[in-house]
Curated annotation (Swiss-Prot):
Protein family (similarity comment): Belongs to the EF-Ts family.
Protein name listed in UniProt: Elongation factor Ts
Record organism: Mycoplasma capricolum subsp. capricolum (strain California kid / ATCC 27343 / NCTC 10154)
Localization terms from the record: Cytoplasm
One GO molecular-function entry: translation elongation factor activity
NCBIfam families named in the record: tsf
Entry-linked Pfam families: EF_TS
């Protein structure tokens, strides 16, 4: 029986099992997802599969480099306690090294990269999930080839924020590091104003206009004056998310853009990972959690 590739993908997302295991499970279950999950559990993947419905919103972010490439990645766990575990930290480092030795360009490709242990990253994650007792997942990564310009990485001490920057020309390592640290601290969404999409601008202007409705002094101003004030507020808001328009945390007497211009370099790539961003955490009342375990 032919197996639908979409079903394989769906089963992998549910169980974190390997691609070929999912294919075999679907073949043995007549393409029935529920029966395929049972098949996987019956064939030794039950422990990992049972944990995949949990939310893994903790973990660490890491940026690492070798002579040719740089990788930035986020690996998630369910609790901060596990994220500080030496076995977990070693696993993340092993995954980073494997990715640096690969040409993977997508999460799907990355999961199939082999680590030094001989297992694929996907298999290593399944094994760690079963051993540690929490869902462990590679959420995302990006692999960047080094160029003739400068590149820099920054890993914050809490292991929750990492940045990767690439410049078009050579930049002093200390200066580059300071910019990378600024990106970690100030969390710009875009390199410059030109990168900000219209959807973001329109959404921000809508919020500004709604807020202005409750300001009697603003509403009393002539329409043209009010319009200019609102535009000014929007420009200020956009500057907050545009790296080059932010005041440099190292010296707030000038903007990041002015600093880079004085060094005759341009930033061509900016990546910032923060653990758990965009993941909705499930908050459980401790008493309820204990009661649930006693049932």
């Amino acid at each position: 029986m032919a197996v639908d590739a979409k079903l394989i993908k769906e089963l992998r997302e549910i169980t974190q099992a390997g691609m070929m295991d999912c294919k075999k499970a679907l073949e043995a279950s007549d393409n029935n997802i529920d029966n395929a999950i049972v098949w996987l559990r019956e064939n030794g993947l039950a422990k990992a599969a049972k944990k995949t419905d949990r939310v893994a919103a903790e973990g660490i972010a890491l940026a690492k480099e070798n002579d040719q490439k740089i990788v930035i990645l986020e690996v998630n766990s369910e609790t901060d306690f596990v994220a500080k575990n030496e076995k977990f930290l070693s696993l993340v480092d092993e995954i980073a090294n494997a990715l640096l030795s690969s040409n993977a360009s997508s999460l799907e490709e990355g999961l199939q990269v082999k680590t030094n242990s001989g297992l694929t990253i996907e298999q290593s994650l399944i094994s760690a999930t079963a051993t540690i007792g929490e869902k462990i997942a590679l959420r995302r990564f990006e692999l960047v080839n080094k160029t003739s310009g400068s590149s820099v990485i920054y890993n914050h001490a809490n292991k929750r924020v990492s940045t990767l920057l690439v410049f078009d020309n050579k930049l002093d390592s200390t200066d580059a590091y300071n910019v990378a640290m600024h990106v970690a601290a100030m969390a710009p969404k875009y390199i410059n104003m030109d990168q900000i999409p219209d959807d973001f601008k329109n959404a921000e202007m809508h919020i500004i206009k709604e807020q202005a409705k409750d300001d009697a002094k603003l509403q009393a101003k002539p329409a043209n004056v009010l319009e200019n004030i609102l535009k000014g507020k929007l420009s200020k808001r956009l500057a907050e998310v545009s790296l080059l328009d932010q005041l440099f945390v190292i010296d707030e007497s000038f903007k990041v853009g002015d600093f880079l211009k004085s060094k005759h370099v341009s930033l061509v790539k900016m990546i910032r990972y923060e653990v758990g961003e965009g993941i909705e955490k499930v908050v459980t009342n401790f008493a309820d959690e204990v009661a649930a375990q006693l049932k």
